[in-house]
Amino acid sequence: MSNTLYNHCTKLFQSIQRSLDELERGVQDESNTISLAGIQGQISASFLSLSRSIDDYDSMVQRELVPAKKKKATIRIQEFRQKHVQLLEKFDELKAHVRDIAQAKNRKELLGRRGYVNSLDSPYGNSTTDAEIVEGPSDLSRQDGLLKEHDFLGRAESQVDEFLERGRMILGDLVEQGSVLKATKTKVLNAANTLGITRHTLSLINRRSKQDKIIFYCGAFLVFVLFYLIYRWLR
């Protein structure tokens, strides 16, 4: 089981690294901020799954009886946690760049639309009247309000995309954990037949397996309910 968790953590690290590289390329190319927000949501969900998997691996290593294996696994956990912190710092840096790109893009679009509207409203081109000078501060405050509103909507859209992607990743992680539990149960039952474990112990294992299934299906149901509520809210 410890090898399974180790391989799972390794795959998550590889997946996060690929996603961070993709996000970094998107930042350099100043790609669509919506697609970048989707990548951010995927990475956030992967970090949650990784942190939980490392904790599970650490908990299992503490119960290891062979000193050599326990020492080796403890070193692996330390390396995992250090790499986790490094990747998280890089992710925070890239998220800051994405926010800067989105704000600059929104500000540019609003200023462009504002200039276009002013050119249509003014029949005298670039000439400045006393009324326009008086109304200048009001126009600036209204423009600042539009910028703030646009930035808020952009952040809200990014958060919704991130939440949806996180829910999808959590659901996938639940499915994967269900498969791991099923495989573990099979191994335990085979070992029980070999070692002659009592029926009482087997019944406890079966009961725990049923509880895990209930938790899995309840979690999946809650995720689908959240998806439905978000869908209704977006409509």
From Swiss-Prot:
Superkingdom of origin: Eukaryota
Membrane-spanning parts: 214-234
Localization: Golgi apparatus membrane; Endoplasmic reticulum membrane
Cellular component GO terms held in the UniProt record: cytoplasm; endoplasmic reticulum membrane; ER to Golgi transport vesicle membrane; Golgi apparatus; Golgi membrane; late endosome membrane; SNARE complex
Membrane disposition: Single-pass type IV membrane protein
Regions of this protein lying in the Cytoplasmic compartment: 1-213
UniProt keyword annotations, A-Z: Endoplasmic reticulum, ER-Golgi transport, Golgi apparatus, Membrane, Protein transport, Transmembrane, Transmembrane helix, Transport
Vesicular side: 235
GO MF terms held by the record: SNAP receptor activity; SNARE binding
Keyword Transmembrane in record: yes
Alphabetized Pfam families for the sequence: V-SNARE_C (PF12352)
Entry keyword Protein transport: yes
Residue runs in coiled coils: none
GO biological process, one term: intracellular protein transport
Biological role stated in the UniProt entry: SNARE required for targeting and fusion of ER-derived transport vesicles with the Golgi complex.
Protein family: Belongs to the BOS1 family.
Subunit structure: Component of a SNARE complex consisting of sed5, bos1, bet1 and sec22 or ykt6. Interacts with YIF1 and YIP1.
Protein name as it appears in the record: Protein transport protein bos1
Lineage: Eukaryota, Fungi, Dikarya, Ascomycota, Taphrinomycotina
